[in-house]
UniProtKB/Swiss-Prot annotation:
Motif mapping: Nuclear localization signal: 64-71
Pfam families for this protein: VPR (PF00522)
GO CC, alphabetical: host cell nucleus; virion component
Protein name: Protein Vpx
Record-stated family: Belongs to the lentivirus VPX protein family.
Role of this protein: Plays a role in nuclear translocation of the viral pre-integration complex (PIC), thus is required for the virus to infect non-dividing cells. Targets specific host proteins for degradation by the 26S proteasome. Acts by associating with the cellular CUL4A-DDB1 E3 ligase complex through direct interaction with host VPRPB/DCAF-1. This change in the E3 ligase substrate specificity results in the degradation of host SAMHD1. In turn, SAMHD1 depletion allows viral replication in host myeloid cells by preventing SAMHD1-mediated hydrolysis of intracellular dNTPs necessary for reverse transcription.
Length: 111
């Protein structure tokens, strides 16, 4: 067996998977903390709610997969925001008040 294809000593598959889940949680939390300075909080909540409703409830995917899909959507939203010329820290942004009723539960890191 090629030594490059072996798992390094002290790294079992369970540890690697656990590290991936921990990374996903840390990344989502950090992304949400940054995104709240650039995108309306309501938009972030809506992306979280719709990701959960579609990927978890409708498609029956795992919680980690749902979080991963949310992460991809938010990364894309932040990328588009920055490429359009971010001026949020100088000018700020509105609350995104297009939705009536109570706000949805917050995503991880914004509770």
């Amino acid at each position: 067996m090629d030594p490059r294809e072996r798992v390094p000593p002290g790294n079992s598959d369970e540890e690697t998977v656990g590290e991936a889940f921990a990374w996903l949680e840390r990344t989502i939390t950090e992304l949400n903390r940054v995104a709240v300075n650039h995108l309306p909080r309501e938009l972030i909540f809506q992306v979280w709610q719709r990701s959960w409703a579609y990927w978890r409830e409708e498609q029956g995917m795992s919680i980690s997969y749902t979080k991963y899909r949310y992460l991809l959507l938010m990364q894309k939203a932040m990328f588009v925001h920055y490429t359009k010329g971010c001026r949020c820290l100088q000018e700020g942004h509105g609350p995104g008040g297009w939705r009536s009723g109570p706000p949805p539960p917050p995503p991880p890191g914004l509770a």
